[in-house]
Amino acid sequence: MIPIAHIENDFPTKFGIPRQSGRVGALKARIVFEPEYRNVDACRGLEEFSHIWLIWEFSEAKRTKWSPTVRPPRLGGNVRKGVFATRSPFRPNSIGLSCVKLEKVALDEPDSPVLYVEGADLMNGTPIFDIKPYIPYADCHPEATGSFTEYSKDHHLNVEFPQELLERIPGESREALIAVLADDPRPAYQNDPERSYGMPFGEKDIHFRVDGDILRVYNVTEFVKKQQESRADCGK
């Protein structure tokens, strides 16, 4: 498949990305079409839908071999489930599926059409293979059950972010950042209160520790891109 677009957002690495789309609605992103598909007619009528589906590639999680079972982080990393019973990025075909809110379709920008979306769970630069409208009567199933994923859907942390550190974050990004931290960006099996984490967000590196249900930010520094290779991968 050939990418038709890519996403632009504040996640330069995999660490910290919400584990599911829609978990952090305050996250904003741009979807920019590749030149061959940059045609306003291709998006005609899309603005009439409130949400869209993104079909994309786990471009940073490719493997030459696949395993029939994986260990979901939310089960502590020790329990195996069939790969098709999870949303693990390590799949025979590294394809992701996300439902996001469509904020607007911009037609007056140099690289138009540009889609502004909220609640995406993709890394900056992720290639997108297709975009489809979300159809409520067909796509919504209130009676659906979610197996082991139900156990962590309400898990949140209380975030303590000193004002002097918060002021280092651009004003328009603060709400989204706090929501990402509250969603607990750590791998689920890491619970050491003395452990320090560094989460890249935009052009900053957010340093924090977690003790119980409290996440404390203790420093905000400039993000150095070469650090990317050493980041932990939260998975899905």
Report residues per predicted region.
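Conserved positions in beta-strands of structured domains
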Residues: 8, 100-103
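Mixed-charge, low-complexity intrinsically disordered regions
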Residues: 1-95, 107-116, 120-236
